Amino acid sequence: DVEADNLLEDATRIHCLSYTSDGKNYQTIFDYQEMRDFILIQKGLIGHNIVRYDVPLLEKILGIKVKARLFDTLPMSWVLNYERAGNKHGLAAFGEDFGVPKPEIDDWENLNPEDYAHRCVEDVKINWLLWRNLLKRFLYIYNNDKKLLDKFFRYLEFKISCAASAELTGWKLDVGLARQCVDTLTTRKADKVVELKTVMPKRKVTTVKTKPKVCFKLDGSVSSHGDRWFNLLDEHKLPRHYDGEVTVVKGWDEPNPNSSDQVKDWLYSLGWKPCTFKYNKNKETGEENKVPQVRKNGELVESVKLLIKIDPAVAVLEGLTILQHRLSIFQGFLDCERDGYVKAEIDGLTNTLRFKHKKPLVNLPGVDKPWGEEVRGCLIAPEGYTLCGADMTSLEDTTKRHYMQPYDPAYVLEMSQDGFDPHLDLAKHAGRISQSDIDNYNQGTRPDIKSLRKNFKVVNYSATYGVGAPKLSRETGMNVREAQALLDAYWERNWSVKAFAEAQ
């Protein structure tokens, strides 16, 4: 483990380097030349985020090139500890688990070297325990086949080194275009808010009235306070002896399109039936709270879009939603920009070992979406360079075919033919479209099938991981019966997926 005076980009000094080779004896180095001599003779180094921080830092400050094999316990934890929250993969969190508290330090420039060394050693202690824990579990998964496990570790090292290289290189940002888009969208957003205020219902402002202490004068006649109270009861058709609270309308405020509650109240008044929810689980009680969602991934959910037919004013909300989302992207570019570049950082791995990305380069709209060309256009190549990209076709589906082949070779052969679309094939198998419809779609004469394909794509991928009808219903907006029908069609067609899973 290494402690420095700042994060990688701004670090100018390494305070110390601590290490152990047996989990019992811990050493700390303060001298730069001793660090060089130590690092350059190592065949393997184990560290937490060592690929993306410690090694780049050592190479930057010491002017060396580390050639040792790198075993990074951070991505290893992402792989095995997939149920841990994103912020629970750090050494501080594991220190709590292992009973080795991570020392806190707020000043990274002026403390004694021993203070930094103490923290550094404790980090090494925590990481030693984490490494032993991870290694034991990996060996169990790989049936103690160390050669096979080493292949996986090499792959993981390569993958994270690619991420480290991307983060170090950065992505050149067209700052001028980003600022121009922020200015334009800010103006348009304000206009949309004003427009939406004219179509949303005004908000009722209420106050609570209570019975006055004195309703009658000494002579028995009604007091002025009593008179107002009894008139209020008459207005609300309440008996004169009523002495509870009365809610009255105080006035009407202009609607606030930025208020989630007010927007939802408006949609409910139009007959909105939510289909997309966010589920918040109470950690203490285990109870799940279902929160209706108006937006998802920067767009209105399908159940809200349906209301445009009932009230075209909902289209204004759709426009505002897109503007807000795109504005946040461009603003994120500018917030994260440094010397004309933004970082393509990662924040974890999915269960298929894909990267989870961090702001600002995450979930960017395609060029076929509103403002997609401008968003992508902000990411440019330096002078003399060309941007290029590569992707694998149907990575998960291809992996699935590999395991299905021994059980259902005929279906795998069919899926391997040029032009085969697993999502449209499932739609055909479910009776939603015909082969001629698919042919017309491929020829560009049935673009309307694209939305249908999108739903069946969700089914194809989520069903493989055991999704149930209720959750699929929430994800697609269809009812539970329709979702179950699609799942039935999927498993009838992909029975071999269960077969090879059960055989493991």
Segments predicted by a language model, with ranges:
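Conserved "right-hand" nucleotidyltransferase catalytic core of DNA-directed polymerases
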Residues: 3, 102-105, 113-373, 380, ...
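Active-site-proximal helix-loop-helix substrate-binding element of RNase H-like nuclease domains
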Residues: 8, 12-15, 19, 23-32, ...
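Short secondary-structure boundary/capping segments
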Residues: 14-16, 60-62, 269-274, 359-365, ...
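Short, amphipathic alpha-helical "recognition" segments used to contact nucleic acids or chromatin
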Residues: 453-465
